[in-house]
Every structure is written in C-alpha cells, then in structure tokens.
C-alpha cells in the first residue's frame, strides 16, 4: 500500500493547486520559528502545515530547517504517534522533489540519501526511481556512490532491476557528456545492470551495449560480470560466445571458473538443455576440479531441472561419471554425488531413489551420496533406518568419516535408540576408525542419564581391550553409581568385584556410591564389609568418605567399626564432627535396649560405651 501511494504521488506535481503569495520577512521568521518548534516537539502535522504555507508563498525555509524537516519525515524511528509512516514518507518524497525543482542548492546530499534509505526500508522502488529521475531532470547531480547502492538494493528486492537499467544508462551519459567522474557507476552498479540485461530481460543487444558502456567508463569486468554473460549465452545456446568468454578470462588472468560454470549450468537448465549442464559439471572436473566449489543453490537448480524433466536416470548417470573423474583426495562434502543428493533432500525429493537408480545402473557415487541421506534420517529421528543404511555402506566397502558417525550416534542417543547407537559404534570399530573417544563418551553419558547401567556394563566389557578407547576407573564408578541409584545393589556389588578383578583401582567415589546405596536400603552390614576391604587395601581416607562411613555405621549400630574409622581419622588428622554423630545416634539409636548381659554381647556393649564416651552421650 505504501509503495503504491508513493508511486501515484510521484506522478503529480506537488502544491500545483496552491495560489502563490509573497511572505514578509516577519512572516517568514514566524513560520521558521513555528517549524523549528514543531520539529523539536515531533509535531509532524504542524511541521507539514508550515511547509505548505511556505510552498503556497513560493518560498522555502532556512536550509538547515528544510533539511531537518525532510530528515524528520523520512525517519523510520519517528516518535510521532499521530502520523503514520506512510504519510510521513509520502510527504518526504513530495517535499524533496519540490525542493529539487524549486531550489536544489538548499538540499543536502545526505538528506537525499536519508530519503532513499527510508524508501529502501519501505521497499518503495517506484518512488525511489522517480526521485533519481527528478534529480537528473533538474540537473541536480548527487554523487553516484551516495545513492546507487540504495537504488540497486530496493530494485533488486522488488524484482525490478530492469527499471534500474534506465537510471544506470542516464548516469553513464551524464558522466561522459558533463565530464562528471563522480556520476560514474561503479563495478557493483555495472554488474547489477548487467544482471538485469542477462537474467531478467535476457537481451543480448542490451548486454553487449552495456559492456561497451563499461569500457567507455573504464570499469573493468570481474568474474561476476563474465558469469552474467555466460548465463545469457548458455540460455541462448551460443557456445562460441562462451568459448570467447573463457579465452578472455584467461587473457585477463582470472583463474577460477566457479562463477562462470555455475552461471552456465543455470542458463542451460533454464533452456532445458540438461545434457549441456551435465557436460559443464564433468568439464569442471577435468580441469582444476572446481565442481567442489559449486554452491548448494547451483546443485538445487540442476536437480530441480532433472526432476521436472523426469530424468532421474540421467542424474544417476552424471553422479557415476563424475565419480570416475574425481580424485581420491576430494572431500566428501565437495563431491558431485554429495551435492546432487543433498539437493534432492533439500528439495524434498527422495535421495534414496537416487541410490536405487545408482544400484540399478551398477555404478557407484562414492560415500558422498550417502551422507546427506544419513543426515536427513537423523534430523527426522529415523535412526534405525540410518543404522541399516550404514550396514549397507560398510558391506559395499565404503567408509564413513568420524563426524558422520558422531552425528548419527548423538541422534540415536537423543531418541533413546540405544541399540542403533551401539550397532553404529561396533561398525566404527570394525571399519578401523581411528578416533572412538567422543562416540564412546556420548554413549556412556547417554546411558548414565537414562539409568541403563546394565547396557553400560556390557558396553564397557565389549570395548575395554580396544586401544582406541580408554576405559578408566570413573567409567566403572558411573556403572556402580547407576546400579546403586536404581536400587540394584547386587549388580553394583558384582560390578565392583569385576572392577577390582580387572585391576581397575577403586577410588573414593566408588566407595561413596556403594555406601550411599547400602544406606538407602538399610543394608548397614555391607558397609562393614566395605570398610574391611578399604582398610586392607590401605587406601587413603578422605573427609567425605570418612563421613559417609561413620554416618552409615552409627545408623546401623556397628560402633566397633565406627571406632576404627574414628581412629583412622585421628591418625590422618581428619576432622570429625562428633556433635553430628551424637545427633545421628540420638535419632536412630535412642530406643536401643541392651539385652540381658551375656558373654557374647560383652564386646558390643564395650564398643557402645566407648562410642558414647567419645561422642559425650550421657543417656
């Protein structure tokens, strides 16, 4: 709506119906004062009324005020809530063109740029073009570099680069005829105009005329310039012209053909000549291997052309032929097979159908054709299908890279598809992948978070002899901790025995997990057993572990063993908070009744009395 309004207003002559009358110096001063106050207070409507009063008298305010007004009207961040952006921008356009026609010397170049910047944000290409044409018509020559880029952007965004071509030509004419170098369009503008000729208008005559204009202006073409011409020549089937372009690029020292080849592919696809498009891909591989530089956009354009023509067989054939030409050092992501299948996936076309066609033709597209499909499966959560495809890949003698394995294993663990994750890891081991550490940690962490200690134990047993995996004590600790947390203390104890049998050294965390597990199930005698083993190993006792032992032993009533722990703490100068264990005793053993004295209970009574004396318990 805004663009339409501005376009219509650009066709009218502003203030043409306002009768002219002369302002006295006093009136002009009063108007300027009112205008200044209106701008300060952001009263847009009042400021506009004052400007109309000036226009009615065929006059204009002070230069500074005039530029401030137009800048205010153009602002996208104007705080005036009473006037819409559409109205303000319309008024900015009208006032600017009026000043250009009336007295352009009052208009600052930066003010014109501000207006055009706002038109760009409003996507108003029609008024922007009209404003520049008004400047030309009234010989108000603003340096091209102040407005050219803005006009190109707004025209390109609206798909009207062809409209920019007229302004470009006029600016070239002015620069030459008036000998004004600052009006010369630069290379960016020349390429935009060339894009309009080649891509939008597809006019050979206009394109060649524009190249001549560039030569007159001294603007040297770049790779993009040749690319636009290559598109047009391919679109028209002018092979000789393309050969001339390549020779010219060689003469000018352009080594890369990436843009040229991409543009040729685009032109051939647009004309329906898919065979020639395929030839460009293969030709690029015969040269310096620039197929690896083709963008995703180019591959999507190529694939779309083949799919619309129902030529999947030809697409598969292209992959096979390209695979024969690609060097062994070609990166997976840079292969033609990867580019084509990845484009299929992006366009929503089944990449698997390409694989089926490759198999039907008895050819190979290399590992690159599989990677996009695997990534798509992972993104969609189809991890079991991805794993099945990996099995097929391995059986064909191909090998995936570590990053692809990592991605698939992470996706499988996220989906809780532990079977697929473990299967993929086994495949990694069998294919002799050098780095297994990251995937190993991913699986162990995921199984721990999901409380699957039995799978963790099986996994560790399976991989612990593999030199590429470092199984350490903390891995066993994680398994023991998970078993204890889920109440499976028998399994935790068995894992502990297995750990020590394999000569992995238990540490404080190992014992803490076991103690906390037994305490939660009130199996305090097991803590006594652990203490005996700990003491026999002559392991180093730390404060947290001593606290865990004492807490469990006091709760269980094993005061003799508790005294051993206290003695060890004193020996190692570990602080023991006796008030804490006094509280634990009073909480758990306050109803303790000594049985009738018997010979076999005497030792227990002695330990109880000794502990009470140590903790200063008088009851």
Curated annotation (Swiss-Prot):
Alphabetized InterPro entries for the sequence: Pentatricopeptide_rpt, TPR-like_helical_dom_sf
Residue stretches in coiled coil: none
Which positions does the entry assign to PPR repeats? 186-221, 222-256, 257-292, 295-329, 366-400, 401-435, 436-466, 472-506, 507-541, 542-576
Q: Which keywords does the record carry?
A: Mitochondrion, Repeat, Transit peptide
Name of this protein: Pentatricopeptide repeat-containing protein At1g68980, mitochondrial
What superkingdom does the record give?
Answer: Eukaryota
Classification via Pfam families: PPR, PPR_2, TPR_At1g68980
**Keyword Metal-binding annotated:** no
PANTHER family, alphabetized = BNAC05G43320D PROTEIN (PTHR46598), PENTACOTRIPEPTIDE-REPEAT REGION OF PRORP DOMAIN-CONTAINING PROTEIN (PTHR46598:SF4)
Gene Ontology cellular-component terms for this entry are: mitochondrion
Recite the lineage of the species: Eukaryota, Viridiplantae, Streptophyta, Embryophyta, Tracheophyta
